């Protein structure tokens, strides 16, 4: 029986080992914005195979329904005989293959949304975000294979972090499993490509679009940022890394991958303060190659591509990264200590001055990213708080706490090194929220129940002076109470339109709603600037009669000015020499 079981096991392993999925990606007519995809499946024993297209892109927490871009799915066997294809659910197709050892599945993907998380194709270039283009075989995400890119005749280059299968075949790539495949975006066209070395890693930059960049400046400055990032973790796991940069009108940020990133920036961003912001984006996305792609909760890899993957730790994944994308620019010499504190001051005042900060805990903001952060509405500022900025402030608290507790011997860098080594290097896995908290408590030497209750699972306003005590930073509370309209306006065709209303404000009490047009005040026609100037001149208790148009119906509302208390803090360096500050803001 044991021999029989062993033989059976070997046969099964052989069958699984022989399974491959090969993709052919072509674009014969870029002006119609369609990629043509052919999947060649070999070695699958099932008589019926289900193939699916993901509903989301890892790193961007929103169900995007990529299957909406696919019109028709066809399948044949190795002899070219048509196979039955039945749509099973919104993003899944079932193929009856019978005993066929080879199955060819073909479909076209509409690609005309140029962002870091979606795909695009026109006569200037093509960009593939894998999760929106490549289907996978259900229950076989671990299957390996090849990708053959067939560029349009006018395109000469393909840039991707996927390894080339053979040196003499520049457009044939290989992948180890589906996660690997879709974690490597592909730029196709005539992009500018250059290389540089930093931290012992070859870095390639592929730039689409004109801009005011200078190649040598990018090499120098990106290298400085990368060197500082690598020092945080004391090692860089990559041998090669790719930056895909899209120079466009409306830059949209970046998206992280394990050994590459895509950055979307305004084409004129490469000078002055805008260039420093660009370097901050570089720092942010590059930091993710450790924090998110390797240091991660269980929910962030391997992925379930058919539905949301919930975690309450985005305040760590994105918040810690946001803290370091500024701190590392300080270490690299792009900020002074005062400039860094000014950045932190702005973050603190943004968070504490937001109504939503008193409503949504940062752990909840993480979990609800799928339905709130990526789907904002006119009321979002009253009910939500970004885990990016709030998380960066929490990271600063923890950094200072570790520095103070160790008298300047250790900092948050060392904690990140610890969990990177424990969970990624040695265990090769993610962690739970409780495991993260336990490791943090062990490293800081403190019970963090109250800290979590106040700042992670709660919405308390921190005592900033106490938290930064002993760090050579003076925190001044300049919270003020002033008359406040409680509404924001936008101008549309010369009309003053209400765009946002703060909850429990004078505007809300008066009955104003978003999208109302304010036409007049006390019998006089007013513009947006008139209203804003008038509101600034009012004292608490003063009244106005506003003429409103809502859904083309005119009516009046009585407005009474009320006060609003907005928390605000100033952060300044003290004049004293401070060992802990010197270590923190080095």
Where are these regions (language model features)?
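Juxtacatalytic substrate-recognition/specificity segment
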Residues: 192-314, 320, 324
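Extended catalytic-interface subdomain
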Residues: 316-332, 336-337
């Amino acid at each position: 029986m044991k021999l029989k079981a062993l033989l059976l096991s070997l046969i099964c392993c052989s069958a699984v080992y022989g399974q491959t999925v090969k993709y052919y990606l072509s674009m014969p007519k870029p002006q119609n914005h369609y990629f043509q995809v052919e999947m060649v499946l070999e070695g699958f024993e099932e008589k019926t195979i289900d193939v699916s297209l993901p509903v989301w892109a890892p790193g961007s927490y929103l169900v995007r329904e990529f299957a909406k871009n696919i019109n028709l799915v066809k399948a044949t066997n190795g002899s070219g005989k048509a196979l039955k294809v039945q749509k099973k659910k919104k993003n899944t197709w079932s193929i009856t293959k019978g005993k066929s050892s080879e199955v060819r599945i073909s479909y076209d993907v509409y690609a005309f949304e140029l962002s870091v998380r979606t795909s695009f194709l026109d006569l200037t270039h093509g960009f593939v975000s894998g999760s929106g283009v490549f289907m996978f075989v259900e229950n076989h995400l671990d299957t390996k294979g090849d990708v053959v890119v067939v560029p349009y005749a006018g395109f000469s280059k393909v840039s991707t972090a996927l390894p080339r299968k053979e040196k003499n075949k520049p457009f044939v790539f290989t992948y180890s499993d589906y996660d690997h495949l879709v974690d490597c975006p592909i730029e196709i066209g005539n992009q500018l490509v250059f290389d540089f070395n930093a931290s012992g890693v070859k870095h390639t930059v592929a730039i689409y679009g004109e801009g005011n960049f200078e190649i040598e400046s990018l090499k120098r400055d990106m290298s400085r940022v990368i060197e500082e990032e690598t020092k945080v973790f004391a090692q860089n796991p990559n041998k090669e890394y790719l930056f895909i940069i899209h120079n466009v009108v409306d830059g949209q940020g970046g998206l992280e991958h394990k050994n590459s990133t895509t950055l979307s920036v305004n084409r004129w961003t490469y000078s002055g303060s805008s260039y420093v912001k660009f370097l901050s984006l570089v720092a942010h996305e590059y930091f993710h190659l450790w924090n998110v792609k390797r240091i991660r909760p269980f929910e962030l890899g391997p992925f379930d591509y058919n539905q949301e993957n919930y975690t309450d730790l985005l305040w760590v994944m994105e918040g810690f990264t946001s803290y370091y994308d500024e701190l590392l620019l300080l270490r690299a010499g792009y900020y002074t200590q005062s400039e860094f504190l000014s950045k932190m001051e702005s973050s603190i005042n943004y968070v504490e001055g937001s109504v939503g900060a008193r409503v949504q805990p940062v752990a909840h903001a993480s979990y609800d990213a799928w339905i709130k952060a990526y789907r904002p509405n006119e009321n979002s500022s009253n009910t939500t708080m970004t885990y990016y900025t709030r998380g960066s402030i929490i990271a600063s608290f923890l950094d200072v706490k570790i520095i103070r507790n160790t008298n300047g011997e250790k900092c948050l860098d060392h904690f990140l090194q610890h969990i990177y080594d424990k969970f990624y290097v040695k265990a090769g896995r993610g962690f739970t929220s409780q495991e993260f908290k336990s490791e943090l408590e062990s490293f800081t030497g403190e019970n963090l129940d109250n800290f979590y209750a106040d700042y992670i699972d709660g919405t308390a306003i921190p005592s900033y002076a106490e938290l930064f005590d002993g760090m050579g930073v003076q925190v001044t509370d300049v919270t003020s109470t002033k008359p406040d309209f409680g509404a924001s306006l936008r101008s549309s065709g010369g009309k003053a339109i209400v765009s946002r209303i703060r909850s429990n404000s004078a505007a809300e009490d008066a009955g104003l709603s978003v999208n109302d047009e304010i036409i007049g005040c006390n019998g006089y026609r007013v513009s947006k600037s008139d209203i804003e100037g008038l509101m600034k001149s009012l004292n608490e208790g003063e009244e106005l009669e506003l003429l409103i148009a809502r859904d083309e119906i005119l009516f009046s509302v009585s407005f009474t000015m009320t006060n609003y208390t907005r928390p605000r803090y100033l952060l300044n360096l003290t004049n004293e020499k401070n060992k802990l500050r010197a270590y923190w803001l080095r």
